[in-house]
Swiss-Prot record:
Keyword Nucleotidyltransferase in record: yes
Name of the protein: DNA-directed RNA polymerase subunit beta
Family from the record: Belongs to the RNA polymerase beta chain family.
One biological process term in Gene Ontology: DNA-templated transcription
Organism this protein belongs to: Ruthia magnifica subsp. Calyptogena magnifica
PROSITE patterns associated with the record: RNA_POL_BETA
Role noted for this protein: DNA-dependent RNA polymerase catalyzes the transcription of DNA into RNA using the four ribonucleoside triphosphates as substrates.
Top-level taxonomy: Bacteria, Pseudomonadati, Pseudomonadota, Gammaproteobacteria, Candidatus Pseudothioglobaceae
Catalytic reaction(s) noted: RNA(n) + a ribonucleoside 5'-triphosphate = RNA(n+1) + diphosphate
Listed EC numbers: 2.7.7.6
One of the record's GO molecular function terms: ribonucleoside binding
Annotated NCBIfam families: PRK00405.1 (NF001616), rpoB (TIGR02013)
Length: 1360
């Protein structure tokens, strides 16, 4: 196999038994692909999807009078003004200007108004500004008002039809009531439901129910038509005392004979006997066409069609009449010889529609429509036109109802219609088919649907959500435009005058700014960002709510297999409602989640891979990945455990149709990062996958010794690492930039031969963690496309590295690891193993107030010189200054006055200057418990407001930096172009004299060295083709020079122009303070198996337990934390980690020994380590230098990969421990650091990858003496952010009462709470040196009195 540049440096020993034939897809594809298809990026001709489809669905808009029409032509997204970094800095949205080309068509008023015959009088075409559309960044996020946000995909109920029952919970009788629902993508929901009397009702949009026949009648069916649609008929020929029944033998099956059934004078079925299949077969054989039955047989049967009087034509008996004695008499009197009755068989088909029809009070189509109108619009007057318009708009018009492509496909599939396409509105046939299927289900001939299966839930991704917002905005615009079009010709209007962009841009802005699904990006580490973008939420608009979601919808469903992770979900009230995509899952064109499988044919696994949705999966028999397969792909076992129709079954290998693609297919990215996941309890695995997202990036990331093999994929797909676009050679590298000279073979003449990668240095993430990139390459390194060039936060050599590998011992230690507490060695802190950098952004605004503008200045009243020492003359802190709690970062004064100044007073003050006492100090200060170093200051000034000296110097610095970057880039590119020119000219004959070189002389590299680039560009050779290529390259250099010059001018203009600031803000100063935080008591740490704990003590190195060789333990964990938690994976990780470290020590010894045959010795040892188990590595292809470099990188341990559900076996761990010269038990004799005595028994020792979580004690620790109080109750505020106090609640009061601490209790309930007067007296007595507590009236009593007074009851207090 081919290794990448970084993989060669450090190979992870993979123990997976079966390699997947499919590589992991781009983990951010669900976001990026959806948005790209919405804006149709990189497509020359626009398809009918996304934004283009929205415009096409709303336009053309035609005037009411039909003489004007506005049509959509095309749209264009312009380049954003600022790049992503500038948007974050300035606090603006990274967006593109959307311009839409519309044409206004005016028709001749004298011509026909018919669409096809209208004469066009005039066409006015114009580009319309339709607002700003936020663009997705390369990492799948949006920058909204300077902050990175992620739009979470939504899992909602799929449009289509669904059949269900209430499980007998609705009615007290416990009777199961069936129902069905047609769910459109947009429009009214249509519900059909049975009541406990078995009548069928319809609800529109969950309104009051109506008999289903009312809807059918409104659709144009008569009573007779309704019965004909839903029932079969039986023909009866009437005689004087009996009647002949038309015989259909199959209909008699399972009924009880009401009379003797006789054929050829033989009694086939006696009266009172149940008719069986055998009887039916006999009757068919005999071939009876009719049977004579007594007239009493007709009683209680239902007439299927109207019976008319032959003479008058009047209806004698209407359809759906139950035959009683009187009806038989009427038939006899009128000499009716033939009637048709409904075939109703109690055991097969119920009379539901017939019974419901009798309840229906409507008789005609218009009456039925009126009835629906009164339910939908109660209280509104119902005219015939309004009634018809409402009914037609409900389900049958595109502008009000849309089933969508998905809905039509689901509806057709469920109803058994062959085609998956059709109209996006309902038809009469659709509604009738749904009712028929519901009756079938009620009769037991079909089954209800599973509501929670992923076949009935689809993903609505970002593109679709913005599409819906655009449609909402354009529909608002449409109403206004339609009215305006009537005046289009007379007022000489243009499209620009008619279209108002505000409703559209407001809808989009509202979605990105305040939608429940547009979330502040989780950016603690690369994994948290990837997981956030792959999150699937059932909450949000059009989804579920926490309160109403039951257990079933939250539970893991068999259809989640390979699509949604069964492990990763939040622990709180959102459990099961927020899920994460499985590693290989993707959405199909309908929005349903699909997972890949390998096709199995005749018991043989093929190389063909198919993506299958939950809808199609039901028909397949799917084997698991661990099924035994031979070298030729043949399934070896006779009986194989498979999944079929959501159940596990044992089947013959020939019946298997698909097989899983990979063992980690079931899990999400975070869950598949947990080694030995298969040995952990699911609850702890859930905590483990959630806590990995909270790991803070440490100063020096360290790869996990025990991983799962997916670490590299996560690191590269998260885009925190820098990856090469093309293969080439590293030309130059420093801390902030990497320059690659692209392979000349892969560079076309028109392309640049240089790639320049600028690295991110000490940038702030959303959670204030540090984003910093470090180069991995050296000058001269040969790299390939997609190789990792630079590490980002929490990555080590292109692999995800969330924590540190710590030497662990599972043992009790003086109670310091009681209840999951963690004991750590002082050495861990001294080595800065868990030191993290946190960057905080603090912002000061200078506003224009009613009393005059606020001023940023160093001249602040009543502030000492010492407090101003770190500020420059403008009043802004210096970069590099060390600041602590309470220090001023930006000096600012705000005008204060009792009265609002008149314009005249303002003018006088402006002329004669202001007095110092008219301003108050409103400076930006460092928070009480914070400290750090100022690493950057940015000043933004509004247009037409004069910039101060500091702002000008910052701008000049930024401009200088841009100029240097441009000069460097151009120098590199120009140098590369002329290097290629020299190569092209070399060896050719000169055609014209150039300086000292004569015509006809052969050009060599030595000759050309004497010439500068200017001279080189003038050389002409005899070969015309070479001259042409050289001219093209020189032209390219000049074009690049012009491009850079233009770019510099644009950047200069951007810097010099005023910033877009919030209303009323004149100036904005951003100060970035970096804090270095070491590990300390109270910080939270965790492993990857849900084994979390809080540091209880930092012990001196000499007190820690130590091994025989004197090496000390880094972390001591409680062994009692393992058995009850059932996360044994952590113990296995410790054993394998110990073996990995031991192998590293052996390699170190070999390198340090420096034997003559060292390379061979190391090569043989590495071959034994890598190729004795699991995946085989091709070490023979490595050169000696590469082997030595690989060995050098393995000094700290050989990294292992044990994929989830396909991990290393116990015997292999023991073999590795033996190979590393360590005890096979994984246990060692430890000695007490304080006494030197050995512990009683051997202890499990090894290496575990431990994380420092973003729950730091410094951010939580808080103390208050006095501080702010609530305005109404006058009680202290709560929370650290408000510098609040600690709540002393009801139960705490009981505790003090129990101890009889009366004085303390009085103090708590009065002066320390809301006794304002008492507080003042207390302060005075402390100042006077006395110790008196005098309580006056608590403010909460005054509040209570006020509330009683608001009820109209006066309360007066009497003095006693």
């Amino acid at each position: 196999m081919a290794y990448s540049f970084t993989e060669k440096k450090r190979i992870r020993n993979n123990f997976g038994s079966r390699e997947s034939i499919l590589t992991e897809p781009d983990l951010l594809a669900i976001q990026i692909d959806s948005f790209n298809s919405f804006i149709q990026k990189d497509s020359k001709t626009k398809q009918d999807i996304g934004l283009h489809a929205v415009f096409q669905s709303v336009f053309p808009i035609t005037a009411v009078n039909g003489y004007a029409q506005i049509e959509y032509v095309d749209y264009e997204l312009q380049e954003p003004k600022f790049n992503v970094e500038e948007c974050k800095l300035r606090g603006v949205t990274f967006a593109s200007t959307l311009r839409v080309k519309l044409s206004l068509v005016l028709f001749d008023k004298n011509g026909s108004t018919l669409k096809k015959k209208r004469k066009i009088k005039q066409i006015i075409e114009e580009d319309i500004y339709l607002g700003q559309l936020p663009l997705m960044t390369e990492t799948g996020t949006f920058v909204i008002n300077g902050t990175e946000r992620v739009v979470v995909s939504q899992l909602h109920r799929s449009p289509g039809v669904i059949f269900e029952h209430d499980k007998g919970k609705t009615h007290s009788s416990g009777k199961i009531l069936f129902s069905s629902r047609i769910i459109p993508y947009r429009g009214s929901w249509l519900d059909f439901e049975y009541d406990h009397h078995e009548h069928l009702y319809v609800r529109i949009d969950r309104r009051r129910k109506l008999p289903v026949t009312t809807l059918l009648r409104a659709m144009g069916l008569s009573s007779e038509g309704i019965l004909e649609t839903f029932f079969e008929k039986t023909t009866i020929k009437l005689k004087a005392k009996s009647c002949d029944l038309n015989m259909v033998p199959i209909r008699l099956q399972r009924t009880i004979a009401e009379f003797d059934i006789v054929a050829n004078q033989d009694v086939i079925v006696e009266k009172g006997r149940r008719i069986t299949a055998k009887h039916v077969k006999l009757l068919k054989k005999v071939g009876i066409k009719s049977i004579n039955v007594p007239l009493e047989y007709l009683l209680d049967k239902v007439i299927s069609a109207d019976i008319f009087d032959k003479d008058t034509g009047e209806i004698l008996i209407s359809a759906n009449t139950i035959i009683l004695e009187e009806v038989l008499e009427l038939l006899n009197i009128n000499k009716i010889k033939k009637i048709e009755i409904l075939y109703i068989n109690a055991s097969e088909t119920g009379a539901y529609i017939s019974d419901t029809l009798r309840l229906d009070e409507t008789q005609t189509e218009i009456e039925a429509r009126m009835s629906i109108y009164h339910v939908m619009r109660p209280g509104e007057p119902a005219t015939e036109d309004a009634v018809n318009l409402l009914f037609n708009n409900l389900f049958f018009k595109n502008d009000r109802y849309d089933l969508s492509k998905v809905g039509r496909m689901k509806l057709n599939r469920r109803l058994g219609i062959g085609s998956e396409t059709g109209e996006h509105v309902l038809t009469n046939d659709d509604i009738i088919s749904v009712i028929k299927l519901l009756i079938n289900i009620k009769d037991g001939n079909d089954s209800v649907d599973d509501v929670d299966t992923l076949a009935n839930r689809r993903v609505r991704a970002i593109g679709e959500m913005i599409e819906n917002q655009f449609r909402v905005g354009l529909v608002r615009v449409e109403k206004v435009v339609r009215e305006g079009l009537n005046l289009a010709e007379t007022d000489e209007l243009t499209p620009q005058d008619l279209i108002n962009s505000k409703p559209v841009s407001a809808a989009v802005r509202e979605f990105f700014g305040s939608s429940q699904l547009s979330q502040f990006m989780d950016q603690v580490n690369p994994l948290s960002g990837v997981t956030h973008k792959r999150r699937i939420s059932a909450l949000g608009p059009g989804g579920l709510t926490r309160e109403r979601a039951g257990f079933e919808v939250r539970d893991v469903h068999p259809s989640h297999y390979g699509r949604l992770c069964p492990i990763e979900t939040p622990e709180g009230p959102n459990i099961g409602l927020i899920n994460t995509l499985a590693v290989y899952a993707k959405t199909n064109s309908y929005g349903f989640l699909e997972t890949p499988y390998q096709v199995v044919k005749n018991g043989k696994v093929t190389k063909e891979v198919v993506y299958v949705s939950a809808i199609d999966e039901i028909t397949h028999t799917i084997a698991q990945v661990n099924a035994i397969v031979n070298d030729k792909g043949k399934l070896m076992s006779d009986l194989i455990s498979c999944r079929h129709k959501n159940e596990f079954v044992l089947v013959n290998s020939s019946k298997v149709t698909l097989i899983d693609i990979d063992s980690k297919q079931i899990a999400s990215v975070a869950a598949s990062l947990i080694p030995f996941l298969e040995h952990d309890d699911a609850n702890r695995a859930l905590m483990g996958s959630n806590m990995q997202r909270q790991a803070v990036p440490v100063l020096k990331a360290e790869k996990p010794l025990v991983g799962t093999g997916i670490e590299r994929v996560v690191a590269t797909d998260s885009r925190v690492c820098v990856t090469a676009k093309h293969s080439g050679v590293v030309e130059a590298v420093d801390a902030s930039r990497i320059v690659i000279r692209v392979d000349s073979k892969k560079t076309k003449a028109s392309e640049l031969g240089v790639d320049i990668y600028n690295l991110t240095k000490y940038s702030r993430s959303n959670q204030n963690t540090c984003i910093n990139q470090k180069p991995l390459v050296k000058t001269g390194d040969k790299i390939s496309a997609a190789d990792v060039l630079a590490d980002g936060p929490s990555t080590d050599m292109g692999e995800l590295a969330l924590g540190q590998n710590m030497k662990i011992a599972f043992m009790p230690w003086n109670g310091y690891n009681f209840e999951d507490s963690i004991l750590i060695s002082e050495k861990v802190i001294q080595e800065d193993r868990y030191t993290t950098i946190h960057i905080e952004e603090l912002t000061a605004y200078s506003r224009d107030t009613k009393l005059g503008p606020e001023e940023i200045t160093a001249d602040i009243p009543n502030v000492s010189e010492l407090a101003l020492a770190k500020l420059d003359e403008v009043g802004v802190v210096y970069v590099g200054a060390r600041v602590k709690g309470g220090d001023i970062l930006v000096g600012k004064v705000t005008p204060k006055s009792e009265t609002v100044l008149s314009p005249e007073e303002k003018l006088l003050r402006a002329i004669f200057g202001e007095k110092a006492n008219n301003v108050k100090d409103s400076s930006l200060r460092v928070g009480a418990s914070k400290s750090g170093v100022v690493i950057d200051v940015q000043i933004f000034t509004r247009d037409r407001v004069e910039k101060d000296d500091r702002a000008l110097s910052i701008d000049a610095e930024r401009l200088e930096r841009i100029k240097k970057d441009i000069d460097d880039e151009f120098g590199i590119i120009d140098g590369d172009i002329f290097r290629r020119v020299r190569l092209k000219l070399s060896g050719n004959m000169l055609s014209k004299v150039a300086g000292d070189i004569k015509a006809g002389e052969k050009l060599s590299a030595k000759l050309m060295k004497k010439l500068d680039n200017k001279d080189i560009s003038k050389l002409k050779v005899e070969d015309a083709a070479v001259n042409k290529e050289v001219a093209a390259l020189i032209k390219q250099a000049k074009a690049k020079q012009i491009e850079f010059k233009k770019f510099f001018e644009e950047e200069k203009a951007k810097i010099n122009e005023g910033a877009e600031l919030p209303p009323g803000v004149m100036k904005m100063v951003k100060v970035y303070v970096a804090t270095s935080k070491t590990l300390q008591v109270g910080d939270k740490m965790a492993g990857r198996h849900g084994n979390k704990g809080v540091i209880s003590r930092v012990s001196p190195v000499e007190d820690m337990p130590y091994l025989v060789d004197g090496s000390t333990i880094d972390v001591v964990l409680n062994p009692l934390g393992v058995p009850s938690r059932m996360n044994v994976g952590q113990v296995l990780e410790v054993h394998l980690g110990y073996a990995a470290k031991g192998l590293g020590y052996k390699i170190t010894a070999m390198l340090d020994e420096k034997r003559t045959d060292m390379v061979k010795q190391i090569r043989d040892f590495l071959d034994e380590v890598y190729n004795s188990y699991g995946k085989q590595e091709n070490l023979a292809s490595f050169s000696d230098e590469e082997i030595i470099e690989l060995a050098s990188n393995l000094r700290e341990g050989v990294p292992m990969a044990t994929p989830v559900f396909d991990g290393i076996k116990e015997k292999d761990i023991k073999s590795l421990l033996k190979l590393a010269d360590l005890p096979e038990s994984g246990q060692e004799q430890l000695y007490d650091g304080r006494t030197g005595e050995p512990f009683d028994r051997h202890v499990t020792v090894g290496y575990m990858h431990m994380l420092k979580l973003n729950h730091l004690v410094n951010d939580k620790m808080h103390a208050r003496s006095t501080g702010p109080y609530s305005l109404v109750t006058q009680q202290p505020l709560s929370g650290k952010a408000q510098f609040g106090g600690q709540r002393f609640g009801e139960m705490e009061v009981w505790a003090l009462e129990a101890y009889g601490a009366a004085h303390t209790l009085r103090e708590m309930l009065t002066v320390k709470s809301d006794d304002v007067g008492g507080r003042a007296k207390m302060y005075k007595s402390i100042v006077d040196g006395k110790n008196l507590t005098e309580s006056i009236m608590p403010e909460s009593f005054n509040v209570l009195v006020k509330e009683i007074r608001s009820l109209g009851i006066d309360v007066e207090l009497e003095q006693h």
